[in-house]
Amino acid sequence: MGRAMVVRLGLGLLLLALLLPTQIYCNQTSVAPFSGNQSISAAPNPTNATTRSGCSSLQSTAGLLALSLSLLHLYC
């Protein structure tokens, strides 16, 4: 019973190590200093949209990996 608990704790820490960096990376925003010569545009930044969609797919992939490992651990 002690070994199973250690294995579950290790798996939990591994999942945390996999998911935490993706959360930190996806929540970072870059702020550009405002200059009086620049006009404010209402159009979205295409590079920002690409980064967000890539981040979303990375999160879903990490989530699927976590779910797969959890199910594997339960049934094996």
Curated annotation (Swiss-Prot):
Residues 57-76 form a propeptide. Residues 1-26 form the signal peptide. Extensively O-glycosylated. The carbohydrate structure may be regulated in a tissue-specific and developmental stage-specific manner. Expressed in the central nervous system, in postmitotic cells of spinal cord, hindbrain, midbrain and forebrain. Expressed in epithelium during the development of non-neural tissues. Expressed in tooth development, specifically in mesenchymal cells differentiating into odontoblast in dental papilla, as well as in the developing eye and hair follicle. Glycans are attached at residues 27, 37, 48. A lipid is attached at residue 56 (GPI-anchor amidated serine). Keywords: Cell membrane, Developmental protein, Differentiation, Glycoprotein, GPI-anchor, Lipoprotein, Membrane, Signal. One of its GO terms (molecular function) is protein tyrosine kinase activator activity. One of its GO terms (biological process) is CD4-positive, alpha-beta T cell proliferation. It is a lipid-anchor; GPI-anchor. Its main location: membrane. It is found in: Cell membrane. May have a pivotal role in cell differentiation of different cell types. Signaling could be triggered by the binding of a lectin-like ligand to the CD24 carbohydrates, and transduced by the release of second messengers derived from the GPI-anchor. Modulates B-cell activation responses. In association with SIGLEC10 may be involved in the selective suppression of the immune response to danger-associated molecular patterns (DAMPs) such as HMGB1, HSP70 and HSP90. Plays a role in the control of autoimmunity. Belongs to the CD24 family. This is Signal transducer CD24. It comes from Rattus norvegicus. The gene is Cd24.
